[in-house]
Amino acid sequence: MEEVAGMQPDIICLPELFDTMFVQEQKPLSEVAEDEKVPGIVTSRIAAFAKKNNCYIVCPLVTKKDGSFYNSCLLVDRKGTIAGVYHKKHPVKTEIFPDQAFKGGGVIPGAIDQPIIETDFGKVGMLICYDANWSEAWDNLKKKGAKIVFFPSAFPGGRMLNYYALKNNYYIVSSTGGDARVIDISGNDLDSTSNFVRYAWAAINLEKVNVTTWPTNGMLPDLFKKYGDRLGIKVWGNTEVITIESRDPQLKVLDVLKEFRIPTYEELLKNETEVQNKYRPESGKK
């Protein structure tokens, strides 16, 4: 974290169980877990760093609450306070069974419906590792309005993360013990780690949306003519998706779409689904 502090990040995401990975098999769960309400050794240091560097930190570790243990993510805000907690919904069974992944106990699954968290730059969600295999978990974060999903993990997640980013029109930031990525809403990597750099970093624009090439492609000349470089427009031919972003703080991308009557990717699919359902044989429509 000290290496990236000079970049003045708004938020840093650490890997799953970054403080105890492999240690939890030697030390009792009760010793490595930290209370969610009372700052422990790790959370105190993370909080101090966040406050000093004016940034948020996604801090994944084992927590204890009301006598139970969870594989968790704490979101520490710029003031060094805990802004929210996420409990891993789908832990591997070896995490649950006592004395397998964790010495002297096991964690329990988090609630299926958990709130997303408000930050000063937008709503964020969190999922952890094995959660990646349940697509409804990703869809639910979209329904709740998440703009960025943080994914601390023990495995990379691969192409499924790129798909979820495109499908749900949000950014995904993954962080593992082996690699890290920042994935654009188009489903393409903005940055990733390498053999030479151990962290991924990217500036992201939340004034950015996905639309489909049809019917938008016919409107591109007029968009360029009116707004020029105030808009960033990228056509992704292989998925027939166009990303449109505002490069002007005074220009809201949704206002531009409304002006040109361009539906977002989600709006188009919603409308198409409504028409399809209306005319299905079981709907009674003749």
Give the residues covered by each predicted segment:
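Alpha-helix-centered segments that form part of catalytic cores
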Residues: 39, 51-52, 107-115, 126, ...
